[in-house]
């Protein structure tokens, strides 16, 4: 299976944003975070935003293009449709619901068969979660200490997601509004990047 192989912290620094949420992600060895940034061209800004959005959700280029093409055909703002579809991927929902400490860990959980959707095992990270879908930790996986710890220590809640710790289940209540999605990116520039191709 294809993977994004660039070291996570290095990728965060090159994009200028902490896409993994780790407190040390933006630090260089022996240096403080941050450096003077050169002024980017219009194309450079669009490319940067595209790279940031791909990195946030861990999506490879070939699959990302499919999301963009679908978003361009959707009604309303294409950029908003793009980020909403990425937000509702199964691996991201597993992360947002608190089962995993990162999207990378969530993707591994899905790949290894730990996750059920509406009572059935789904091992495809890109599986699109629909409103009212129930996402659950498989019964035998509920005894894995790391997953228990992740769920119990989750401190961030989202209004568009409901999580029941006692039943190891989460549910997408509605499609999130753009301002509710905690991703620092100008998604409209991403659409502009691909619309010129």
Swiss-Prot record:
Domain S4 RNA-binding: start-end pairs: 88-153
Gene3D superfamilies for this protein: Ribosomal Protein S4 Delta 41, Chain A, domain 1, RNA-binding S4 domain
SUPFAM superfamilies: Alpha-L RNA-binding motif
One Gene Ontology term from the biological process aspect of the record: translation
CDD domains, per database record: S4 (cd00165)
GO CC annotations, alphabetized: small ribosomal subunit
UniProt-recorded Gene Ontology molecular function terms: rRNA binding; structural constituent of ribosome
PANTHER family: 30S 40S RIBOSOMAL PROTEIN (PTHR11831), SMALL RIBOSOMAL SUBUNIT PROTEIN US4M (PTHR11831:SF4)
Function in brief: One of the primary rRNA binding proteins, it binds directly to 16S rRNA where it nucleates assembly of the body of the 30S subunit. With S5 and S12 plays an important role in translational accuracy.
Protein name according to UniProt: Small ribosomal subunit protein uS4B
Native species: Alkaliphilus oremlandii (strain OhILAs)
């Amino acid at each position: 299976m294809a993977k994004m192989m660039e070291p996570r912290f290095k990728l965060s620094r090159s994009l200028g944003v902490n896409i993994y949420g780790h407190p040390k992600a933006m630090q260089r060895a022996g240096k403080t975070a941050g450096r003077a940034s050169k002024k980017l061209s219009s194309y450079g800004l669009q490319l940067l935003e595209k790279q940031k959005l791909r990195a946030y959700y861990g999506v490879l280029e070939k699959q990302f293009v499919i999301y963009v093409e679908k978003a361009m055909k959707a009604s309303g703002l294409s950029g908003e449709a793009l980020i909403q579809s990425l937000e509702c991927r199964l691996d991201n929902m597993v992360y947002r619901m608190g089962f995993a400490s990162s999207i990378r860990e969530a993707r591994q959980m899905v790949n290894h068969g730990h996750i059920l959707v509406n009572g059935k095992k789904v091992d495809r990270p890109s599986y699109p979660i629909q409103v009212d879908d129930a996402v659950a930790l498989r019964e035998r996986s509920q005894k894995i200490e790391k997953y228990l710890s992740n769920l119990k220590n989750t401190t961030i809640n989202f209004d568009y997601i409901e999580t029941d710790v006692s039943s190891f289940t989460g549910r997408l209540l509605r499609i999130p509004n753009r301002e509710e999605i905690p991703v620092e990116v100008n998604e409209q520039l991403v659409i502009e990047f691909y619309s010129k191709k």
